[in-house]
From Swiss-Prot:
Gene3D superfamilies documented for this protein: S-ribosylhomocysteinase (LuxS)
Phylogenetic placement of the source organism: Bacteria, Bacillati, Bacillota, Tissierellia, Tissierellales
Enzyme Commission number, as recorded: 4.4.1.21
Name of the protein in question: S-ribosylhomocysteine lyase
NCBIfam families in UniProt: PRK02260.1-4
This protein's encoding gene: luxS
GO-annotated biological processes: quorum sensing
Family: Belongs to the LuxS family.
Source organism (scientific name): Finegoldia magna (strain ATCC 29328 / DSM 20472 / WAL 2508) (Peptostreptococcus magnus)
Cofactor note: Binds 1 Fe cation per subunit.
InterPro entries: LuxS_sf (IPR037005), Metalloenz_LuxS/M16 (IPR011249), S-ribosylhomocysteinase (IPR003815)
Cofactor list: Fe cation
Reaction equation(s) it catalyzes: S-(5-deoxy-D-ribos-5-yl)-L-homocysteine = (S)-4,5-dihydroxypentane-2,3-dione + L-homocysteine
Subunit structure: Homodimer.
């Protein structure tokens, strides 16, 4: 089997940031998949499922309310070091920096019940940690608010 593109990224050099993971074509539409990397792989602890789950619910709610039909998907990476965001359109990392700032500011300032945090709405509603979601959101904002080229383009 051929190695898929995401496994060709040097995770030993990968830093937290916003990266274009891939672009797919569906008819005349371009779908851009972004790698929203929150922790440095293999060098920082991964996020626990509870904070990942809270960020997923808050992030999906925020993005779908803000961008509506432009959002195809927002969800966690299996390695728990970040999230994938798939948007309609041929986009670059730089194009969504302000959006990602707004998203993680929303999460870091969020108070109240997490959207969809009920047995009726979610298959694992009790596994959410808003405090840690805020912690990781603030950590990520430190990177995004001082974004550099190495946080926008995958390392060689």
């Amino acid at each position: 089997m051929n190695k898929i593109e995401s496994f060709k990224i040097n995770h030993l050099k990968l830093m937290p940031g916003i990266y274009v993971s891939r672009k797919d074509y569906l008819g005349n539409e371009v779908l851009t998949t972004f790698d929203l990397r929150i922790t440095a792989p293999n060098r920082e602890p991964v996020m626990n499922t509870a904070e990942v789950h809270a960020i997923e619910h808050l992030g999906a709610t925020f993005l779908r309310n803000k961008l509506e039909n432009e959002v195809i998907y927002f969800g966690p990476m299996g390695c728990r070091t970040g999230f994938y965001l798939i948007l309609v359109g041929d986009k670059k990392s730089e194009d969504i920096v302000d959006l990602i700032k707004e998203l993680f500011e929303f999460i870091s300032n969020y108070e109240g019940e997490i959207p969809g945090q009920s047995a009726k709405d979610c298959g694992n509603y009790s596994d959410m940690n808003l405090s840690m979601a805020k912690f990781y959101s603030n950590k990520y904002l430190n990177v995004i608010n001082n974004i550099k080229k190495e946080n926008l383009i995958y390392p060689e």
